């Protein structure tokens, strides 16, 4: 149906040398380290992950938005408790944040450290603005975003780190279901 091409037709368009295969992943990772790249290219998918919600999506959780607007130290304490893996309780972190805000008005300098820790823990992309700018310009929005990120990752920020870990242990021990007392079986009409 179609005319056949002459045998040398392909050769006149080729560059001459066959293309080389890309280096294997291990060699590529070593090359990146030699050039000073700070991204881990050996991770599947490579690159950083996006936040589960945007910075301005605070109305995705209106309750948290209201609490953060009225008393940001509560949201900060909840986020810090999870990010620090329970080493500093929610009340202590919130109190320190509140004191820094009240005495200097620069709580954003303290809270941006926790945003950086959260991003490092979950390989989250920093975006166009550094953490310090996000917290200094949009403190309440940043706290709400961090809260939603942890919530979307399965944490219940209202119960703290220890209770979340206990809940996770019970869930794993029960094959995915939370173990508890067996359900009561109604006996019906028995004589």
Swiss-Prot record:
SS bond list: none
Membrane protein topology class: Single-pass membrane protein
Transmembrane domains' residue ranges: 91-113
Pfam families per UniProt: PLAC8
Residue span of region Disordered: 13-44
Tissue: Expressed in roots, coleoptiles, stalks and silks. Detected in leaves, apical meristems, immature ears and pericarps. Highest expression in coleoptiles and silks.
Domain of life (superkingdom): Eukaryota
Any one GO biological process: negative regulation of cell population proliferation
Locations listed in the record: Membrane
Biased composition (Low complexity): 27-37
The entry's keywords: Membrane, Transmembrane, Transmembrane helix
Any one annotated GO CC term: membrane
Family the UniProt entry places it in: Belongs to the cornifelin family.
Main function: Acts as a negative regulator of cell number.
Name used for this protein in its record: Cell number regulator 1
Organism from which the protein derives: Zea mays
Lineage, opening ranks: Eukaryota, Viridiplantae, Streptophyta, Embryophyta, Tracheophyta
